[in-house]
Regions:
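Membrane-embedded alpha-helical bundles of multi-pass transporters/translocases
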Residues: 1-504
Length: 504
């Protein structure tokens, strides 16, 4: 909301989006993606089989190496920022000052990679120790501190600091990363895993746990980064979209970015949360060769993800334009921007369940010591995404919305493929029960969609439609799911209540 009010959907925000996405790709390579996927299973196995002292040593060595590796990547990113911008958004040269602004902002924001990579390692340590509170809310702190500090530096006190609003927001991203790390460190120490930095590289590489993490991280960097690579492919196409007169458009990159922010909310609350909570249990089952428990935990978690994300996707599609208008349509963000962003959000929502399942299923392979399978599927998804995006732009006329739809199709393809491939590894995934559950959830979500449409028609205002439509949609889904006897409903209700802070 703050960014839309300050920058709208034009050249400045296009530059900001691209400048953020390149270091965010590196973040996905080292932080929430590859590092978490490799570190949590290895740390859990070490804690389970070798004890707390060895796990503490592994945590200290890992933190030291993460600092060195991400520090080196940050330095390279700052030096080669012009090359990255030219590679992923060559169309920026056609708008005076847009290319130079993107380079400057990227150089400012790249250091947040170091903080967030260390924060991801701290989060993995806490999850493996069954300490979910601070670790679960720390990503939200990143967003809050980034916005508030950015506003303070570039807007509220811009005259005193000499910073423009967009530069202030870029610096705020780095401060937010430091806050996400800092808030978790006391909990890490209380858990008994306080970091003891170890800088002897040769000795560090002799540690079995470190070698196992590095062995998993190579393919995992490709596997987990595929989503961000696909986003960059989408950005490349969007940055080159032209209007009827043949001029490069200002707006498509911003519309997709604003839509993805809304899309990421249920993805983070439900998909990432369920995956993060389930992964330590799955890792322990794999370490103990208890594949019956592994299979049950995985199947139950996938069902939970579907139960929460399918109705969320329907809600985004039905109420997307109202929500975007209410939150974003201020200052330089106009009604036309609201409409274009809502189109992209609807297309992203199609793939919400696929995106969320991927957050669980790819790391599940790493707990089995198999990093090759998700890597190969990810490589295939990058190719499929590029071809699908090209087809959408060239033949459908959907523009930026077609790019969002291509991304959704690819995420669903990847999730389904990985689910099929993991079946023989663990003796099945309770596929029949999972399919029946998915059909029931889809039917209940369809009922919810009809009710939401009716409620929206009776209350045409943005606020009125949302205040009446969302509760009506939730109630209708719950009643339909109860009537269809969806087994995961009770557990999902407890999760939602907990995430809303209504119980400890």
């Amino acid at each position: 909301m703050v960014l839309s009010w300050l920058f709208g959907a034009g050249a400045v925000f296009d530059a900001y989006v691209l400048a953020f996405r390149i270091p965010n790709l590196a973040r996905e390579l080292f932080a929430e993606g590859a590092l978490a996927s490799a570190f949590i299973p290895t740390f859990t196995r070490c804690l389970t089989t070798q004890g707390k002292e060895e796990a503490r040593t592994l945590a200290g060595i890992s933190a030291s190496m993460i600092f060195l590796i991400t520090g080196a990547f940050t330095a390279l990113g700052i030096v080669f920022a012009p090359l990255f911008v030219n590679l992923f958004a060559p169309g920026f040269h056609d708008v005076p000052g847009k290319f130079e602004l993107a380079v400057l902002l990227m150089r400012i924001m790249f250091p947040f990679l170091v903080f967030l990579a260390l924060a991801a390692q701290a989060q993995g340590t806490l999850f493996a120790s069954h300490r979910f509170g601070i670790a679960a809310v720390s990503p939200a702190l990143f967003n809050i501190v980034s916005v508030l500090s950015g506003l303070a530096l570039g807007y509220w006190f811009g005259a005193a600091t000499g910073l423009s609003a967009v530069r202030g927001m870029a610096i705020g991203v780095v401060i937010g990363g430091a806050a996400q790390l800092g808030v978790q460190l006391p909990s890490v120490w209380r858990a008994g895993f306080g970091w003891r930095p170890k800088w002897n590289l040769r000795a560090n590489l002799r540690n079995d746990g470190v070698r196992h993490i590095l062995w998993l991280m190579g393919p995992a960097m490709i596997g987990n980064a595929s989503g961000q690579i696909n986003v960059l492919v989408t950005t490349n196409f969007a940055a080159g979209l032209r209007d009827a007169a043949g001029n490069v458009m200002n707006g498509p990159v911003s519309w997709l970015a604003y839509a993805y922010r809304f899309f990421a909310l249920p993805l983070g609350i439900f998909g990432v949360a369920i995956a993060s909570a389930a992964l330590p249990s799955i890792s322990r089952s794999a370490a103990q060769n208890n594949f019956a428990e592994f299979r049950d935990t995985l199947s139950r978690s996938v069902s939970m993800i579907l139960l929460l994300t399918i109705p969320s996707a329907v809600g985004l599609a039905v109420f997307g334009e109202r929500m975007i208008g209410l939150v974003y349509q201020h200052g330089r963000f106009h009604a036309s921007d609201t409409h274009e962003t809502a189109l992209a959000l609807t297309c992203y929502a199609v793939g919400l369940a696929g995106y969320a399942v991927l957050k669980l299923i790819a790391p599940a392979f790493y707990t089995l010591g198999d990093s090759r399978t998700p890597m190969m599927v990810s490589i295939a998804s990058i190719v499929v995404n590029g071809l699908t995006a090209f087809t959408m732009i060239r033949f459908t006329g959907l523009g930026h919305a077609g790019l969002a739809l291509a991304a959704s199709a690819v995420s669903t393809f990847s999730a389904v493929t990985l689910l099929i491939l993991i079946r023989p590894r663990i003796g099945g995934i309770n596929g029949r029960a999972l399919a029946v559950s998915a059909l029931k959830i889809t039917a209940a979500a369809a009922v919810m969609g009809v009710v939401c449409r009716i409620a929206g028609a009776y209350f045409p205002s943005k606020v009125g439609g949302l205040l009446m439509g969302i509760p009506a949609g939730i109630a209708s889904f719950w009643m339909a799911a109860t009537a269809l006897r969806i087994a995961e409903l009770r557990e999902a209700t407890r999760l939602v209540v907990s995430k809303l802070g209504l119980r400890a």
